[in-house]
């Protein structure tokens, strides 16, 4: 969680802890607070069910899914000026069907010949946010 939170904070985003919970204990753990290097204190945190928030957010929602479109396909639209939402599920269960119904862009990190099916959530978040923001920057030039 701390590595993911630092990446989210760097991009000026909010975080929904534990990907669809109203349970604040995950962020209050001493190890999480310490390893976030203070970044946790500068991050907007939403404590409500993710599906409820997505239903009214009015922004494009990107979901990291194994059957998504490759980020390198050239056809994934970049985030809008109003921003976007990136949803990353856990490695075992993925993104719940309740949350998937709000995803407007199903994306994936292409596999370049390796055999790994998925990545650590923090690593996936870093790659996905960098690629999505790079697409936004390139489009505006």
Where are these regions (language model features)?
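Active-site/ligand-binding-proximal alpha/beta "capping" segment
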Residues: 63-115
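Structured adenosyl-cofactor binding patch, chiefly the S-adenosyl-L-methionine
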Residues: 11-14, 24-41, 97-141
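Alpha-helix initiation/capping motif
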Residues: 22, 47, 88, 114-117
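Short, surface-exposed amphipathic charged segments that create phosphate/polyanion-binding patches used
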Residues: 58-61, 80, 123
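RNA substrate-binding interface of SAM-dependent RNA methyltransferases
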Residues: 1-71
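Flexible domain-boundary/linker segments
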Residues: 50, 54, 71, 78, ...
């Amino acid at each position: 969680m701390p590595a993911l939170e630092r990446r989210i904070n760097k991009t000026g985003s909010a975080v929904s802890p534990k990907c669809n919970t109203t349970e604040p204990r995950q962020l209050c753990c001493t190890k999480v607070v310490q390893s976030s290097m203070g970044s946790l204190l500068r991050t907007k945190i939403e404590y409500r069910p993710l599906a409820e928030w997505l239903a009214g957010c009015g922004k494009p929602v990107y979901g990291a899914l194994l059957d998504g479109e490759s980020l390198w396909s050239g056809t994934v639209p970049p985030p809008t000026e109003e921003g976007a939402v990136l949803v990353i599920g856990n490695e075992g269960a993925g993104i719940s069907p309740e949350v998937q119904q709000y995803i407007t862009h199903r994306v994936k990190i292409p596999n370049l010949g390796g055999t790994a099916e998925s990545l650590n959530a923090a690593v996936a978040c870093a790659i996905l946010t960098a690629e999505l923001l790079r697409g936004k920057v390139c489009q505006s030039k």
